[in-house]
């Protein structure tokens, strides 16, 4: 009897451990599926941005653009990435190899982490944190450290100058960007990205922060372009002055990682413009005409999720079009003009906007 009881207890404990292990496996799967789905969406989004930039720049310059790699040249970015993947990875003989190798990885990883707090639809966010927007600002401030490491580790005067410019530019425009985000948080009574979108949806189209914070929107727009180091703010990699800036000594896949980080940063900035100022996944305008169709993105379901994602991406790519058109139409600023714009104009304007927002919130109490 004792042996039988012992066997039964062993079988029961084994079945419990097996069920627990199955639950852990299922939990791990449900944790990894959204992450890999988000990474896949980000990769596709970056490929679309590269294709759009080439087509828009070709249209502005009155030329054809890519047309052989896939239909309408949409696979050209994959072809370029494959080429860089198989090119030789050269290392500077007198540089700091560890800093040289870590720099591109830090730039890419810090930008990827920013996507954790972006809501693509109702309940479609990996991490709905109470400090979501400030987490993005904190994470995005890590990327210039990677660029500075790349410039210093290259042991090249052009690379080091580019890294210093990247750090100075990031500090100059991070402060106005933070003040604009703080104004939005005060207006929405929350720092969660989901709560900010929900606060804008209460009043429909005219409740967007674009209309309630027009000054902050313009400052945020300019500051986000400067943070992405896009023309006319690409001083860290100015070809006429610094060859290629902090990228000068890089080749192969590490060289390609800088471009990946740049486009990832551009996409995440566009998504945050959508979330903070353009109502996120809420379309608002057609609610008057077809409320039963566009109201479903709040009730869940595959159809509602799809509608929310499409609305978010449509708004983000509208801002992307503006960014790409700006790059190919405006000349580059000088470094003194760049810093003066950040410290003497955008910083006082964003600070005044924050004071006005705080005053209006206190009066409304």
Swiss-Prot record:
PROSITE patterns: COMPLEX1_ND1_1, COMPLEX1_ND1_2. Keywords: Chloroplast, Membrane, NAD, NADP, Plastid, Plastoquinone, Quinone, Thylakoid, Translocase, Transmembrane, Transmembrane helix. The keyword Glycoprotein does not apply. Signal peptide: none annotated. It is a multi-pass membrane protein. The chain crosses the membrane at residues 29-49, 106-126, 129-149, 250-270, 302-322, 338-358. It catalyses: a plastoquinone + NADH + (n+1) H(+)(in) = a plastoquinol + NAD(+) + n H(+)(out); a plastoquinone + NADPH + (n+1) H(+)(in) = a plastoquinol + NADP(+) + n H(+)(out). Belongs to the complex I subunit 1 family. NDH is composed of at least 16 different subunits, 5 of which are encoded in the nucleus. This is NAD(P)H-quinone oxidoreductase subunit 1, chloroplastic. It comes from Acorus calamus. The gene is ndhA.
């Amino acid at each position: 009897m004792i042996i039988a009881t012992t066997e039964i207890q062993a079988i029961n404990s084994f079945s419990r451990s097996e069920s627990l292990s199955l639950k852990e496996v299922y939990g791990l799967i449900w944790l990894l599926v959204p992450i890999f789905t988000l990474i896949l969406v980000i990769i596709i989004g970056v490929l679309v941005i590269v294709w759009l930039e080439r087509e828009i720049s070709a249209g502005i310059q009155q030329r054809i653009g890519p047309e052989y790699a896939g239909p309408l040249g949409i696979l050209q970015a994959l072809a370029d990435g494959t080429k860089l993947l198989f090119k030789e990875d050269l290392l500077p003989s007198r540089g700091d190899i560890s800093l040289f190798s870590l720099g591109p990885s830090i730039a890419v990883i810090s930008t990827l982490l920013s996507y954790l707090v972006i809501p693509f639809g109702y309940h479609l966010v990996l991490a709905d944190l109470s400090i979501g927007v400030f987490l993005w600002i904190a994470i995005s401030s890590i990327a210039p450290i990677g660029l500075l490491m790349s410039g210093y580790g290259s042991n090249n005067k052009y690379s080091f100058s580019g890294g210093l410019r990247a750090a100075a530019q990031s500090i100059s425009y991070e402060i106005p960007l933070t003040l604009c985000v703080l104004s939005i948080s005060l207006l929405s009574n929350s720092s969660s990205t989901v709560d900010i979108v929900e606060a804008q949806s209460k009043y429909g189209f005219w409740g967007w922060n674009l209309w309630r914070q027009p000054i902050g929107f313009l400052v945020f727009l300019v500051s986000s372009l400067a943070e992405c180091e896009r023309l006319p703010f690409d001083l860290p990699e100015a070809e006429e002055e610094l060859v290629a800036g902090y990228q000068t000594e890089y080749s192969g896949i590490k060289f390609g990682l800088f471009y990946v980080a740049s486009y990832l940063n551009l996409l995440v900035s566009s998504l945050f413009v959508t979330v903070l100022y353009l109502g996120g996944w809420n379309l608002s305008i057609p609610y008057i005409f077809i409320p039963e169709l566009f109201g479903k993105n709040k009730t869940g379901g595959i159809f509602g999720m799809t509608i929310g994602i499409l609305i978010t991406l449509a708004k983000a790519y509208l801002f992307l079009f503006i960014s790409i058109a700006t790059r190919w139409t405006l000349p580059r600023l000088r470094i003194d003009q760049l810093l003066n714009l950040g410290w003497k104009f955008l910083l006082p304007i964003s600070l005044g906007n924050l004071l006005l927002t705080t005053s209006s919130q206190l009066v409304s109490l």
